[in-house]
Structure formats: structure tokens, C-alpha cells
């Protein structure tokens, strides 16, 4: 089979095809693997496929971010996915995989005024010094792959763009 499957945000869409899919585009492969390509675990050759939830790298040989997949040579543990990354508003398309907004992304006007951190696994409300977004008052929002990260902030966020709201939201608002 050489046909290609339609993309989706979960790798399960390639279950019955000779395709390895990402959230952005499908890729046709020449032969069907003996292991179905519908789970992140199918990347046994140090090559991973991305997903929209960074938890997909928990037990695979992949390290994924919201932005792009990165192949590694050994299966990673949850701790290897804890590299802080910047808000999408901080460095444009280089939103993930940076050591910190302040140092890796620089402190130019294009990066100010948000300097937030999050891990690939669990969004936190930990902000670097000077992390203030005037439209959020004294609170600072940070991105995650699930809007639930707005539970304790005055922001409603998505994987791509944080949006401030006028009052602190409850889990139900997400």
C-alpha cells in the first residue's frame, strides 16, 4: 500500500495505512511496518513522530515539543522532557526547546515583556524575574497543549497563542 492518510492531531489516524502522520502533514512510506504506526512507540529507530500532547515522549525514543519532533538515540524518561521553553509570543516560531526566555531567546524588545517557563509535561505558573504581562495585570500566562493550564492564571492559553482574560478563570472555563 502506498496511499497516504489524512493528517490528524493524534497518531492513531495512521493505524491502517502506510503513513506516518503529524499534526501538519502526512508522509507516505513505501512499506507497512510490522508494528502499526499509530502509536508514538512505533518510532523504535530513533525517529519519532510528533503529536499535540508532549506526553507522547514519555516512553518512546522521541522528544517532542509543541513545535517539532526531535529524534534521540535512547528512550527518554519523563525527566528528559522537562526543559523549559518560551512562550510563543517570546520568540515567534522558536517557541519551544529553549533553555529560558531570558537567556536563549535574548532580552530584546521582541521578547519582552514575558519571560515564562513551562516543562514539556506539566504547565506551571513559575515565571522568570520580570515576568509581567500588563494586559494580565500582575499575573503572567504561559502556553501549554491543553487549555487547562489557565486554572490558576488570569489567562486562557492555547498551544499557539496566549490570550489574556479580564478575570482569573476556573477549570470549568477551560
From Swiss-Prot:
Q: Where are the sequence repeats?
A: 8-12, 13-17, 18-22, 37-41, 42-46, 51-55, 61-65, 66-70, 75-79, 80-84, 85-89, 90-94, 95-99, 144-148, 149-153, 154-158, 168-172
A Gene Ontology molecular function term of the record: identical protein binding
What top-level branch of life does the organism fall under? Answer: Eukaryota
For this record, the Gene Ontology CC terms, alphabetical, are:
cytosol; keratin filament
Which ranges form a coiled coil?
Answer: none
Q: Which UniProt keywords apply?
A: Keratin, Repeat
This protein's record includes keyword rRNA-binding? no
Repeat recorded as keyword? yes
Q: Where is this region: 17 X 5 AA repeats of C-C-[RQVSGE]-[SPTQ]-[TASP]?
A: 8-172
Outline what the protein does. Answer: In the hair cortex, hair keratin intermediate filaments are embedded in an interfilamentous matrix, consisting of hair keratin-associated proteins (KRTAP), which are essential for the formation of a rigid and resistant hair shaft through their extensive disulfide bond cross-linking with abundant cysteine residues of hair keratins. The matrix proteins include the high-sulfur and high-glycine-tyrosine keratins.
Q: Which family does it belong to?
A: Belongs to the KRTAP type 9 family.
Instruction: Summarize the subunit comment.
Output: Interacts with hair keratins.
How is this protein named in the record? Keratin-associated protein 9-2
Which species is this UniProt entry from? Homo sapiens
Gene that produces this protein: KRTAP9-2
